[in-house]
Amino acid sequence: MESGKTASPKSMPKDAQMMAQILKDMGITEYEPRVINQMLEFAFRYVTTILDDAKIYSSHAKKATVDADDVRLAIQCRADQSFTSPPPRDFLLDIARQRNQTPLPLIKPYSGPRLPPDRYCLTAPNYRLKSLQKKASTSAGRITVPRLSVGSVTSRPSTPTLGTPTPQTMSVSTKVGTPMSLTGQRFTVQMPTSQSPAVKASIPATSAVQNVLINPSLIGSKNILITTNMMSSQNTANESSNALKRKREDDDDDDDDDDDYDNL
């Protein structure tokens, strides 16, 4: 810091000498030389602004010249805008005391970066994982129909002919207690066939249980109609007995013819 007395008063301009005198009157004795220039620039800018505002107020009041009242009004308006004093110390202490009464958030027990609560952070993931749904393979095997109650069985045998087996059509009407979704599934129904005790050992017997494949597209929500073609052992027995009877009748006729021939 250099003293203001180092520069000779005679070499300084009149405005600089006046500013140095103002600083001396305020008790400022040590300052840099450029402080005088900054203060002069500030004073020039401030005075110019005040006079411009005073001229505007005078023209608004329809006055011919700028008087002292206009200058006072301009200084008052500029002081309210530019020069604001800081708040009192007591006021600042009261605000600080109220702020310090708020407790700080608890420190997390685990180690790591000291971050605020999760709702204030942007570290949460903004996406969701979609679970892969495994589609059940319908062609893996056959499914047995559970809880099928057979209501009525009707048999309608057709008229048999010699030499050719006649298939028998059976319609089974069943009811399902609860509607089931059987789309795209195949299942097996086991049905016992009726066997007649008159079947001889020479006649090939059919299987006791036959498997019937049901197409799910033909199944309704309540009733199931099963139609199958199977060989009737009873019809086969009837055919064989009829053939034996006819053979015996033919033999009897031949014997009668022989007796008549002998009598002649």
UniProtKB/Swiss-Prot annotation:
This is Transcription initiation factor TFIID subunit 9. Belongs to the TAF9 family. Its main location: nucleus. Coiled coil: none annotated. Residues 151-176, 232-243 have a biased composition (Polar residues). The lineage of its organism: Eukaryota, Metazoa, Chordata, Craniata, Vertebrata. The TFIID basal transcription factor complex plays a major role in the initiation of RNA polymerase II (Pol II)-dependent transcription. TFIID recognizes and binds promoters with or without a TATA box via its subunit TBP, a TATA-box-binding protein, and promotes assembly of the pre-initiation complex (PIC). The TFIID complex consists of TBP and TBP-associated factors (TAFs), including TAF1, TAF2, TAF3, TAF4, TAF5, TAF6, TAF7, TAF8, TAF9, TAF10, TAF11, TAF12 and TAF13. Component of the TFIID basal transcription factor complex, composed of TATA-box-binding protein TBP, and a number of TBP-associated factors (TAFs), including TAF1, TAF2, TAF3, TAF4, TAF5, TAF6, TAF7, TAF8, TAF9, TAF10, TAF11, TAF12 and TAF13. Component of the TATA-binding protein-free TAF complex (TFTC), the PCAF histone acetylase complex and the STAGA transcription coactivator-HAT complex. The PCAF complex consists at least of TADA2L/ADA2, SUPT3H/SPT3, TADA3L/ADA3, TAF5L/PAF65-beta, TAF6L/PAF65-alpha, TAF10/TAFII30, TAF12/TAFII20, TAF9/TAFII31 and TRRAP. Residues 149-176, 232-264 are annotated as: Disordered. The gene is TAF9. It comes from Homo sapiens (Human). The modification N6-acetyllysine is found at K5. Residues 250-264 have a biased composition (Acidic residues). InterPro entries: Histone-fold, TFIID-31, TFIID_subunit_9. GO terms for molecular function: ATPase binding; C2H2 zinc finger domain binding; DNA binding; DNA-binding transcription factor binding; p53 binding; protein heterodimerization activity; RNA polymerase II general transcription initiation factor activity; transcription cis-regulatory region binding. It is found in: Nucleus. It comes from the Eukaryota. Disulfide bonds: none annotated. Residues 120-137 bind DNA. One of its GO terms (cellular component) is nucleus. Induction: 6 to 8-fold by apoptotic signals. Keywords: Acetylation, DNA-binding, Nucleus, Phosphoprotein, Transcription, Transcription regulation. The keyword Endoplasmic reticulum does not apply. The modification Phosphothreonine is found at T159, T161, T164, T178. The modification Phosphoserine is found at S149, S152, S155, S158, S181, S196. One of its GO terms (biological process) is regulation of RNA splicing.
